[in-house]
């Protein structure tokens, strides 16, 4: 039998030490990676339960193993809460990631070689929307749309491509696009050209749930998402769909691309969906958008350009060329100042993908720890201070001290 007193710190001190260092890093640094957030203690607790011991191939009420009566309750809670949160007709909570959620939809409705429209990775899309290095781009005939001359999603291009190529599926959604996407218009283009319509809201899901970003569920045949990022849940994926597609999607996930579901993670998803249904989460989503607006405006005042001119969401792409610094260099030097960002290509970027001319910033994590407009403005100024003098160690140290004061005042997890 196991002794509950033999906790991780006693069983594996080396691993525990690394985890403690990561905890310190998360507490001390301002986290601005748009795809990252902090999960609640309840979400993390769910992932550490005995549910990790249970195999449960199949779906609630239709399992291939015995002893699933309680994991059925867990998974059904997650399904019902997800449907309530977004107004979906049907939902699958088993995908282990957003990428697998997308793959599940593709497997459900496409055959190898079918034509699909997706947003170009170089202009803000995602790997799984047809990038040549990804399985989606290898298995299917993806055609890419992008941005117009104002760096706004080019709906006219989508319409022209759809008319010319008559795709089986049109995919909307992005990993680095700051503005609202007109899902109703995209759905109309799909219908007029005989295509199914899928939306990947991995980045925007928390804002959609909080009423701060358009909800694609009424317009799309399929909506996929991750459950971390702006939803603040565990790392995982989900698929929402019209009822007529439920059987095909469920079969594509299991047995199509996955085996036994991770019920401990599904439990954590259920917790996150309950949290997202609360009035407090709507306040959180609203603050995320307010903070992003202030952060973007502050950076513009300090001489930096925001791709698309502004943000209407949680995320923004910052063009660094005016400062004479690459995204790779900016990521490194801001990291020294305890500000965590990721390098990111800008549209028509002249630099290589591992270098880039931009950085991507997001406000979900900073907002979770309690940052409001004043802290967002200060953060923007601290970023600009570093980028204006990236090789001045004294300047970096001064910014780091201000960051440490700010993060110590607003911890992620209170000590109480």
From Swiss-Prot:
Its main location: cytoplasm. Keywords: Amino-acid biosynthesis, Cytoplasm, One-carbon metabolism, Pyridoxal phosphate, Transferase. GO terms for biological process: glycine biosynthetic process from serine; tetrahydrofolate interconversion. InterPro entries: PyrdxlP-dep_Trfase, PyrdxlP-dep_Trfase_major, PyrdxlP-dep_Trfase_small, Ser_HO-MeTrfase, Ser_HO-MeTrfase-like, Ser_HO-MeTrfase_PLP_BS, SHMT-like_dom. Its cofactor is pyridoxal 5'-phosphate. GO terms for cellular component: cytosol. The keyword DNA damage does not apply. The record marks 228 as: Plays an important role in substrate specificity. It is an enzyme of class 2 (transferase). It holds the Pfam family SHMT. Homodimer. This is Serine hydroxymethyltransferase. It comes from Bordetella avium (strain 197N). The lineage of its organism: Bacteria, Pseudomonadati, Pseudomonadota, Betaproteobacteria, Burkholderiales. The gene is glyA.
């Amino acid at each position: 039998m196991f002794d509950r007193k033999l906790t991780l710190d006693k069983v594996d001190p080396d691993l525990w030490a690394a985890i403690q260092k990561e905890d310190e890093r998360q507490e001390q640094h301002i986290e601005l990676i748009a795809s990252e957030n902090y999960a609640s203690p309840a979400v993390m607790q769910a992932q550490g339960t005995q549910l990790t011991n249970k195999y449960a191939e199949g779906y609630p009420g239709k399992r291939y193993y015995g002893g699933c009566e309680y994991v059925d309750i867990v998974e059904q809670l997650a399904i019902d809460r997800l449907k309530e949160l977004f107004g979906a007709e049907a939902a699958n909570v088993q995908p282990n990631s957003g990428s697998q959620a997308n793959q599940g939809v593709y497997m459900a409705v496409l055959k190898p070689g079918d034509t699909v429209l997706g947003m170009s990775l170089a202009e803000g899309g995602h790997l799984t929307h047809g990038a040549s290095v990804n399985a989606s781009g290898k298995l299917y005939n993806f055609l890419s749309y992008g941005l117009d001359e104002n760096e706004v999603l080019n709906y006219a291009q989508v319409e022209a491509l759809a008319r010319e190529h008559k795709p089986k599926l049109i995919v909307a959604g992005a990993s680095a696009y700051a503005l609202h996407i007109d899902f109703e218009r995209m759905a109309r283009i799909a219908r007029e050209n005989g295509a199914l319509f899928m939306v990947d809201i991995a980045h925007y899901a928390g804002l959609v749930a909080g009423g701060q970003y358009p909800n694609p569920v009424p317009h799309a045949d399929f909506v996929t998402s991750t459950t971390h990022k702006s939803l603040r849940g565990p790392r995982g994926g989900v698929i929402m769909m019209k009822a007529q597609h439920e059987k095909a999607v469920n079969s594509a996930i299991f047995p199509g691309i996955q085996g036994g579901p991770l019920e401990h993670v599904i439990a954590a998803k259920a917790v996150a969906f309950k949290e997202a249904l609360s009035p407090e989460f709507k306040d959180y989503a609203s603050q995320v958008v307010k903070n992003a607006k202030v952060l973007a405006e502050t950076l513009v005042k300090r001489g930096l350009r925001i791709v698309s001119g502004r943000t209407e969401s949680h995320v923004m792409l910052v063009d660094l060329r005016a400062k004479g610094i690459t995204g790779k260099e900016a990521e490194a030097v801001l990291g020294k100042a305890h500000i965590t960002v990721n390098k990111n290509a800008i549209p028509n970027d002249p630099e290589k993908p591992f270098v880039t001319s931009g950085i991507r910033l997001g406000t979900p994590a900073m907002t979770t720890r309690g940052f409001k407009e004043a802290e967002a403005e200060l953060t923007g100024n601290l970023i600009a201070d570093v980028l204006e003098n990236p090789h001045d160690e004294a300047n970096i140290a001064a910014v780091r001290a201000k960051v440490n004061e700010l993060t110590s005042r607003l911890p992620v997890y209170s000590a109480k």
